[in-house]
Amino acid sequence: MTDNRCSDGVSSKRDSALTLPEDLSPLELELTCIWKDIHYEIIGRIRYKYLEGYYRNQWLLANSKGQYKWLLEAYALYAIVDFEGEKIDYSLLKNQEPGNLIGLSNNQSYSLDAISEFKSYMIEGFTPVMLNNIKGVISLELSTTKFDWATIDIDQKQNALVYFGEIVDLKDLNFNKFRQLNG
């Protein structure tokens, strides 16, 4: 069992021995990397499964200063994303479709690449967020031609948070090693 300390101080027990079907990620807990000259360690993972059938890994990176970043992994694409989300007006997101442009608070327009709904999730290691109300969460994946990335998560109450980041090449993160995949 893994102790996951949540943002409200509540700890929840999750079985870390659960197998993750179709887990083809080269990453795993306790690997270290370097991002913008700062050393990080992978301390947690949230693995989302979407109704459409695919998975997204959200790796929690921590540095020695107690700062966090998310490393998103989906479709063999990686993005370093801010840990804290920024509130966004839900009315801006109504009737959006893939291919549309969405202007965000950082004065950039993003292309809406995908709209997906979470089906379930699994947790490994430490995650400082509460995930009790994950069902029904919609995720909008956005990008720019400059390799900027944004993810907008919308909960059941139409609260929307945008997480800004940038697309990265996994080799540029200088991981100390990779998980060995069988097969």
Residue ranges and their predicted role:
Residues 4-27, 31-183:
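Short, surface-exposed polybasic-aromatic patches that bind anionic ligands, especially phosphate groups
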